[in-house]
Amino acid sequence: MVAPAAGAVILVQFPFSDLSRTKLRPAVVLADAGRGDWVLCQVTSRPYSDTRAITLEDAGFAAGSLRTTSYARPGKLFTASRSLMVAQVGRLKREPFQQIIHSVVTLLGAGGSQ
């Protein structure tokens, strides 16, 4: 079982927005939500036209890595139980992690209209 911590990059069954199914994908652990739940941010290898996406490259990892340059998507958050986390693949350095947190806070402060 994964022992998550803020800044960890883990593999988790990430739900589609319509909850029709899930896909195993990486996610950045943002915060402990209590009772074994964690707030996660979706990570993708596709550079969608998401202006909020934050590039994750090998240089941004304190440990581990992803197979390819990837993108954290601060507008794609969800809460998951620790039991759904399959593995930890890395841990971000402070700077990229803080960029993600700042983007989430900005998005929420703007009421989602950023």
Go through each PLM region and give its residues.
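C-terminal terminal-subdomain/extension
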Residues: 62-114
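Coiled-coil-like amphipathic alpha-helices with heptad-repeat character
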Residues: 18-20, 68
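Compact nucleic-acid interaction/catalytic patches
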Residues: 20-23, 29-63
